[in-house]
Amino acid sequence: MALYRRGTASMDADGTVHGTDTKWKDQLALIRVGATIVFLEQPIKLAVISDIVSDTELKAISTDGQTAADGKYVILLNDSLTVNGLAQNVAETLRYYQSKETEIASALDIIADLDMDNLNNIVQEIKSNKSAAEAAQNQAELARDSANSARDESISIKNQTQQISDSAIGSINAAKDKAITNVQQKENSAVTHINSEEAAAIQAINDAKGDLSGYVNDAQTAAQTATSAKNDAQAARDAAVSAKDAAAVSAQEAQDAANSVNADNLLTKDGNLSGLADKEQSKKNLAVNRLNQPRGDLTEIYSNDDRTGFKLIVKDSGDWGAMTHDGSENKALGVNFGGTGGTTEEQARTSLKVYKLDRTNLGEKHLDSITGEGDGPGIYMQSSSALATASRGYPEATAGMLEVLPNGANGASACIQRFTPFTYLGTAPESGNSQNEYARAGRGTFYIRMKNGNNAKFSPWIPFQASSSGNVVSSPASNEKSSWVDYVNALSSQPSSLASYNVNSVGWVTAISVRHRNGQGDGSAFGFVIEDASMTSPHYKDVRLRKQTGAGQWQSTQVIWNTGNTTVDSNGFIKRASPIVDIFGNGSHRTNDESEGCTVERISTGEYLIRGCLSLNSDLAWGGVNGGIEIPKDINGQPILWVDYDVNPDGSLVIKTYHRTHDNAPSFARNHKDGYSDGDPIDIPSDVFVSVRVEMPNDSIYNKKVEECKRNHERMVSGEFVESLKNT
């Protein structure tokens, strides 16, 4: 039969199927391994039978952990969804009952062989055997009667002989013994004969009894066998009739099922499920309704059963994506799933935080229209200098590249624009061939402007330029200058810059050059420069200012006074500094960079010993040849000490201080002090100090630093320093 649905069934998550009132092992059930069991619940669940354990237990595969509650079910015994499968089931059922009909026929043949005539013959034979036994018994009884007669006859003869003997005693005494002997012999012979006959009769009777017993037993056994055979035959006949009836019923059911099949309603293998009346409902029943193929090159998978949510599409071309069920809106694949997070280029760039690289020309677009908002940020190209006009927001009429970077200042439109013009610089240095001209940022120029989110306008373009070498810091080869004239002419011919120059007559000079209008137009005649003429030295003595007038002439350089090349004396005045030692009353001291290494010791009242120097340094600003000591003064500008000094043979200095009065001054300005007269030795007052300008030896700490800087610079120029760093 095509379907089996007896009883109810349930299924565990491990694939075990339990049945109630089922007969799954029954051969007539036609259940085989590989058959499909369908649980009739919502949604329908399917499983494939892998083992038939018992009438009430099956094992199933392909369950995916599904369970089914106890309820109605149906087992598809074969490919019952097709005519071929149904025919196979009907044929198998008929074959089963045909095999049973053979057994029934055999049983009927046995019954035919055991008909009543044969049974009667067997009974008559048994009865005949019984009559023969009874006849044998009668013969034995006759033999016994004959023996008895012989014995009686012998007795009669004996009696007769006795009578003869008695009658002839008197007349035949001589023959008495012989007669007795004869009689005795006859008697013995008779007795022997009688005994023999009696024994034979008894043996015959016993034999007859044994034969009769065997015949009786055989007859009883045969009767029992016949009865059993009859019973078996009757049972076989009944079973055959029952089986025949059941076969007829099953055959009728199969025929009815076959007759009830409408070929138009059957699914055929060749039809590939095309005959389903309601394909959509069938998909739901089989839990595949979320899969759809509206055309040959497109496959869709929906997010829910009623197809009202979203769907995933895949085309044969390889295109795929997610969208609403009706296709009205595409859905982006999130960044967390490996997507861009957007369905447009703008959304994707926003989600991934990247900027647009648009290699199409800006054309006639105004640069003010490209802001930090929306799809504005990115990199743009302008290939036409003719279109790069001021009316379109360009800083100069040159083709170039525009970079737009959002900065979020007070709104989404806030951004920074940077425009880099393209300029042909001529022949590529490595080729010398005019055909190998190449474009790069001309003269290191680029422009920047900004826009605030709450302001509709951009700021003016701000130009940025470097030296003619294209770098903010120049290389020795490009900025080698033969003289100061060559150096200042280079400053005049280039835009504002930060650079260093190797002036042959001086050494390395660092310069910050600010050009009027960035050197354009009349900007070549006006400029201002801050320079360090002793770049490789560890001091600030040669930090200078230069200025160019409108006529293009450079003015004399002006030294910038600073804490590195000046000192403040005890009276608060600035003086040009070299090695300076400040001495305090208690013997403590203070040095600057150049006097580092000097020490001071108070050796007595008003006497201080300075070691580590080579006497005083003569400088007109410090009093000429005999100068070099700055004396503290009062508020009226009058010295409050007398100072003297001695130079020791090793160059160390002894500074001596004495009390100093001004007797001709008003009383408040005479500097009188109790216990001290004018010229008495006295310590330096605690609120002032004496500054001494000293001469330092060549091996002083400062001079060693200067020499080390010079050597390092020479090593850097020669490349030795870089190589030493590589080897460390």
From Swiss-Prot:
Keyword S-adenosyl-L-methionine tagged: no
Cellular location(s): Virion
This protein's major location comes to virion
Keyword Repeat recorded: no
What's a BP term from Gene Ontology annotated to this protein? symbiont entry into host cell
Keywords of the record: Host-virus interaction, Viral attachment to host adhesion receptor, Viral attachment to host cell, Viral tail fiber protein, Viral tail protein, Virion, Virus entry into host cell
Query: Disulfide connectivity?
Result: none
An example GO CC term for this entry is: virus tail, fiber
Role summary:
Probable tail fiber protein.
Q: What is this protein called?
A: Probable tail fiber protein
